[in-house]
Amino acid sequence: MIYRQGTLFKKIVKTISNLYRRFLEYMNKVILCAVLLMFSSTTGCLGSLFGDEDDIDYYPNLNDRHKLDWDMSHSFSRVLDAGPHYALDVQEATFTVDTSDVWETGPSESDVHLSYWLPSNTLKGEKVPVIAIISPYFSYGQPGDESGHTGIVSAGRGEFIYENFVPHGYALAQVAVFGTELSTGCFDYRGEGEGLGIHHAVEWLGSQEWSNGNVGLYGKSYEGATQWEAAAYGSEYLKTIVPISGTTALHPLLYKNGSAEARSQVMHMNYFSSTVDYNADDLDNICPDILEGFFAGPTTYGAGEFDPYMDNYYDERSHIDKAFQNWKGSVYWIQGMQDWNVDPHQVFSSPDGKPWYQIYQEAGFEVKGMLGQWEHNYPDQWTKHNNQETGYGGEAIHNMTRWDWAQDLFEWYEYYLKGVGPKPDLNVQIQRNDGEWRVEETWPPKDAEKKTISLGDCQNTGVFVSGVSVVGGAAQQTVTLECPAFSEDEYTHISGLVKLHLDTIAFFDGGQIFAEMQDSNTGIRLGHATMDIRYHAGGSEPQTVLPNDRQFMKMEFQGIDAIIPPGHGIRLIMTESGEDYLAPLCGNACPIHVIPSNSN
């Protein structure tokens, strides 16, 4: 990768050049108007002299951005033009929230603590919008090894906003969720209590005398989840969210068609152990929901269709559906197509099988997307992009990092938080696995040609899938299918959510299939799908399966956008488990018989 660093001299020359060009354009219009005055009315001439905003590119066109000289001197991207303002000293605030209705035995009142930086134009009485990062990661970690508190600009996400947006007249706020840092109350992992505190933080930021009443949120992973939690409460101050690999609901984060990720067993405990101080004050952080969370993972993993937590614990922690009902803001969705921490199905899956992205889009929400072949990273996080392996985005590294990310986000926030500039194009920027970017109206693309391949046409080895109960599985029996080339003389572009429908016979109330798709010629991984046979209909609703039951497993691959060269086909390798998924609890007692001749 080549890095170009703009110098001060180059920026001065560029600025003078732009001013000179605009002066010449202005003089040409003056001369033209003088000539036209001799022959005709001035109607329209003065309008063209001063310009029509619709006829002039307010920002550089997306297709021309690759020609621009981006500042690549930092660990994150920069806006094209530095703002005229500076950040004032950090300020702090603590306010109390009535929590008497959210926790049965928890505190009736809890405090939210936050820190914020105002831009210098507020000294003149100007009102400004707020960009907030809401997180459990302030003062996070074991005692003596904690991260910074809210009053320190956080590395990465906070620094990115502080450097790029505060100079342009935005306030930056960093908010600690309940039970973390100096915020009191229960650490209610993704629960109703946590959402209530987040909502009141948005309300506080939007109602301050220095605020213009418009709040936008930013952040990745958990800090993307808190954005959906805020949206679920529907604050009128919350105008836009930018979740980057943000969790939309807890159950689909930890389970895919019943297949459990290893972390599902310990997720709540991991967070709780890193947010407490191990002293008497911790008693305030322990509530019934925390104890319930400790048991939710093992119970769901072992009980399947008999799990008592599905209708309470996980439903409470599903936010995207509540936001859809309660909120009317805009969403800029950022997702790594090779992110196996917060999987792409957080964006492209819903209880009825339709992608959430398109559900929001078709309901009239203003939605935009940027989908790159990166992992659990920001679009401009080049230090992480460079470490991706083949089959996991490695083939796209050369064109992956978006040095225009800060500018792209700037144009989004300017419109939705200030009402400045043109409305952003509501499209999807999607990167293919070979690195090529393109623009679609939506994703998965609706104009894609659907093609069905019978697995009966593929050469198969094995018909049983089984293993033992360990993390990642230990295969005893596997199925491999080698399928013929899609085309001998044309490239094939796979784009969307590939379905894998398997005709199977069960041996037990349980059993699981993990399928990896590869390029049959190169062996490069293209994607994966997984399913517990009790969830054979798809989604998260299990059904009891009896021995010798014949079930059609309606599996779906995580989002794939990949190119297949002429003469290449696909290979499917089916094992009991893979990646970081647990093998089924029933182990080698629940093999699954796959019938390729009736599968596709």
Identify the meaning behind each predicted range:
Residues 1-58:
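Secretory targeting signatures
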Residues 55-80, 89-100, 405, 418-600:
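Glycine/threonine-rich phosphate-binding loop and adjacent beta-strand/alpha-helix elements that clamp
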Residues 56-82, 150-151, 155-161, 167, ...:
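Accessory cap/linker subdomain of secreted extracellular hydrolases
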Residues 120-125, 186-193, 200-221:
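Gly/Ser-rich "nucleophile elbow"/oxyanion-hole loop immediately N-terminal to the catalytic nucleophile
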Residues 130-206, 382-393, 579:
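Cap/lid segment of the alpha/beta-hydrolase catalytic domain
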Residues 193, 218-285, 337, 344-349, ...:
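A catalytic-pocket lid/entrance helix-loop region that shapes and gates access to the active site
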